[in-house]
Amino acid sequence: MSRDRTQSSSATAADPIAASPVYPAGSRVNERGRLEIAGCDLVELADRFGTPAYIYSEDDIRGRAREYVRAFEERTDAFEVIYASKALPATAAYRLMREEGLSVDVASGGELHMALAAGFAPARIHLHGNNKTEAELRYAFEAGVGHLILDSFDEIERAERLLDRPQRVLIRVTPGIKPSTHDYVQTGQLDSKFGFGLADELAERAVQRVRESSHLELVGLHAHIGSQIFELEPYVKAIEVIADFCDAVDLRPELLNVGGGLGIAYLDTDQPPEIDDYVEVKVAGVRRVFDPATRILVEPGRSLVGNAGVTAYRVGTVKEIPGVRTYVAVDGGMSDNLRPMLYGAHYEAVVADRAGEAPDTLATVAGMHCESGDVLVRDTLLAAPTVGDVVVTPATGAYGYAMANNYNGVPRPPVIFCREGEGRVVVRRETWDDLLARDE
């Protein structure tokens, strides 16, 4: 999403927050010198709701959803924008996406349950997953889920056995495209746990098997080549490879789901493509090699919510090791943001109390957990961090809450949506008693 253009260039230049691509649109340093998001002072929010806390700009999320829809509407009426809900699987997020006219992608029975609870019409739900259980498939079929994305021969047989009516399906294929991103979020290469390979004829066999089915109605193909992608050319190549496959098996898909994957800015220096450019490449690519009536589906997740959210922490300890490092320890860590440990992900950080001051202390923001690797941000400049400060890491809106865990018996943080200066809790903070709730 483009940054808020309403601010003058001089104001933006003087405000490091407004100038940064990693914060929600409209974020700034307020008159008290503090970080402000969606009109909310982050220090005041931390005092009110406690820390750690996931904090989102609701308008930022809505703005990005509308930008996707607008970008398609300017080019075609044969499209569907599908929220990849694994990025932020909270009922409030599902509800917001439904209100903005998006469909939803769910990858488990739990995500399906939340989508239905948020009011999504079953016909607008797309069920994914490389190992869907019989219970999940039964739930989906009983609910009337619109589209099932088939991922294996075992699943084809399982679905065929459970169904007593027609079910619209897409076959997930792996086009053999390897974009420049982390190995753990590459999904389109031949060696992948997802989908049917095009190069090894598995996809061709899958098409034939589904065509023989009495209940599975093949309406299209799905291909997702990976996540956090800054290059657009791999999408073009993937579409061309899929088109060649369709010609080879005489398939004229009603739907072509070209996945998600658009990267976001995690660092001030990151320059991901704009949503409009991303949509242009996909629409032009599909129109060049497929029938004009083919409906184009995309599945954004990270690019909808990633830069819309930040995480706020409270500093508990500042430990200087002379000649080595200064550790700023906060009251969260790998239980609320696993990505630095899982992917080696890098983040910015700011002292929200002094967001407008020039950072002068080289520090490492460490978590509270019993792991030496529990480091959120390594070797970053902070403005004189002291005990009691609120430290914020931006661009945590995707896969922070989704991957949160109870390591060391730490309750998971709340999710707070902010709009026009008001913050509201949409997921409450867990308590110590919650940790006992499932014990027998």
Report each predicted region and the residues it spans:
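Hydrophobic residues within beta-strands of alpha/beta enzymes
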Residues: V104-D105, I125, L148, L221, ...
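Charged (often Lys/Glu-rich) extended helix/loop segments that serve as interaction or gating elements
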Residues: V281, R287, P292-E440
